[in-house]
Amino acid sequence: MPDTLKVADVTFGGNHPVALIAGPCVMENEAHTLAIARQLLEVKNELGVGVVFKASFDKANRTSVSAYRGPGLESGLRILDKVRQQTGLPIVSDIHDVSQVEAAAEVLDILQIPAFLCRQTDLLLAAGRSGKVVNIKKGQFLAPWDMANAVAKVASTGNDRILLTERGTSFGYNNLVVDMRSLAVMRELGCPVVFDATHAVQLPGGAGTSSGGQRQFVAALSRAAVAVGVDGLFWEVHPDPDRALCDGANSLPLDQVKKTLKEMMAIDAIVKGNTES
């Protein structure tokens, strides 16, 4: 299993600088999605950091049946293709069903397996057979060493281009906690590891018909993960989180991304010995 993974011009793993996966939880509309992507491109160019754009075309696991889910597969992939054409950023989005894999693989650089679905064998095998990079999010119900089974399922297809993402562990009701040892444990599985700091501060179902969150802790948990030596950070971002159609309570305000990322890059450089003497 390669400990370094290159996705377009973004490198995860080895002793490379921490990369960023960022974007809105869900595509609200085309203009909104493109505007966020352009701002993230500016951050990439100004800081010289690797950036992958993320956005969901369908949030199939929303708390409430009436919650906004997104534009759907066809329209969503069209928007994401436009993002790539206009910004050059590599793209990741989550897939929820085997039937989505073929179409998604035509547009996406990374196929993401949602945490709730990380044990779904058919989905993991289909994603692996696509030949695309597969980002498996660790289920909130799994120990980090149990991710070896998910890795083995994808690798059995001959595809060893795998990322693993930590996003917190269930802690009682409506809460998550992050065990930073998980990052080191999963790294031993031979795959680059990403830390999803925004979902880690989510309060699942904590608002009754939606999830709550504590976005004020995103930077603190990101600092801890970078200090451990994580290969990538995953942030859901939004220009106005309080008005976001999904996961606003745990999204990082878009205007804070550059400042917060600069701080993470400084810590990362020290941890990985990449500072200039």
Swiss-Prot record:
GO CC aspect terms: cytoplasm
Entry's Gene Ontology BP terms: keto-3-deoxy-D-manno-octulosonic acid biosynthetic process
Keyword Transferase listed: yes
Pfam families documented for this protein: DAHP_synth_1
Pathway(s) annotated for this protein in UniProt: Carbohydrate biosynthesis; 3-deoxy-D-manno-octulosonate biosynthesis; 3-deoxy-D-manno-octulosonate from D-ribulose 5-phosphate: step 2/3; Bacterial outer membrane biogenesis; lipopolysaccharide biosynthesis
Catalytically driven reaction(s): D-arabinose 5-phosphate + phosphoenolpyruvate + H2O = 3-deoxy-alpha-D-manno-2-octulosonate-8-phosphate + phosphate
Location within or outside the cell: Cytoplasm
Top-level EC class as recorded in UniProt: transferase
Annotated GO MF terms: 3-deoxy-8-phosphooctulonate synthase activity
Source organism, top-level taxon: Bacteria
Keywords: Cytoplasm, Lipopolysaccharide biosynthesis, Transferase
Positions of transmembrane segments: none
InterPro entries associated with the record: Aldolase_TIM (IPR013785), DAHP1/KDSA (IPR006218), KDO8P_synthase (IPR006269)
Protein EC: 2.5.1.55
Family the UniProt entry places it in: Belongs to the KdsA family.
Protein name as it appears in the record: 2-dehydro-3-deoxyphosphooctonate aldolase
Organism for this UniProt entry: Syntrophotalea carbinolica (strain DSM 2380 / NBRC 103641 / GraBd1) (Pelobacter carbinolicus)
